[in-house]
Amino acid sequence: MIQSGCSVAMSNAIVCQRVSRAPPGAVQREPVRLRCEDGQYLDATWTWAVPQPHAVVVINAATGVARRYYQAFADWLAQRGYRVLSYDYRGIAGSLHGPIRHCRASMADWARYDIAAALATAAKLQLPILLVGHSAGGNLLGRVPGLQQASAIVTIGAQNACWRLWSGWRKWGLALVWYLALPILTQAYGYLPGRWLGASGQSLPRQVARDWANWARRRQYVFDAPGLPPARYSEFAGPVQVWSVSDDSYAPPAAVADLARRFGPGGGTLLSVSPAQLGLARIGHFGIFRRQIGMHLW
């Protein structure tokens, strides 16, 4: 997915120097706090292993997934010469301050403020920036202020989450989630309990869950949703890889392809991987970032 000693597997937009792999144990991690434009703070981690990195990677998480889930991937990148910034969206894990029922964070805030703050922080290093977006962390990118600061984008399991792009029973099951289950649960609890999100395990603040459901009822999902900065997907000039996983029920091929076509003047490069290609039984929506699975692909 990402190669060192070349052009980040996509084009010459990010030129990588030939960097020797750092010795075991050389990875360093520094907890930091990111200040957003609206004054909110996010818990984040810088990960690196060489004093002079050749590029910066910003990892933008999936909905309800804590940054620690991506730490193995961040370590792997650091050992190959990247400086890596991972962070928790507001209302999630380390960036949840106080009871979740009182949290006013929205998914729109994630794009408008949180991803924008991470991107601005990375830009201070004056190095090429690669944005890695998992699921929502990829499909929100085109609504992020300052996206032009990035040099390249890789998304994994990012998609148009409108239920109409699924097929068979999953299509109607997802419609029930967006129209009934998620609104009812959110109203009943005052937030969306993490156990309903599968592998991620992080509960969602009320308005985050509402934004997610409201957008997913729309044919254009977040791409033309009101209340966000203007959409810039088609204006992004750097290389874009949009990855799908054959057994990812959260992001079927049609939904991933719908996102890919929106990037740049000619669309992003649509790529796919299957468990069989890697000699695995399953990958799913979250597997690529687990060390035992991801090492076959990274």
Which residues does each PLM region occupy?
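Short alpha-helix in the alpha/beta-hydrolase fold that links the catalytic acid
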Residues: 252-262
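Active-site glycine-rich loops that stabilize anionic/oxyanionic intermediates
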Residues: 62-65
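Catalytic active-site module of serine/aspartate enzymes centered on a nucleophile-bearing elbow/loop
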Residues: 273-298
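Short beta-strand/loop motif that positions the catalytic acidic residue
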Residues: 236, 242-244
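N-terminal cap/lid segment of alpha/beta-hydrolase-fold proteins
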Residues: 12-48
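Conserved alpha/beta-hydrolase
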Residues: 67, 74-98
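Alpha/beta-hydrolase active-site loop
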Residues: 104-123
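Alpha/beta-hydrolase-fold enzymes
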Residues: 132-220
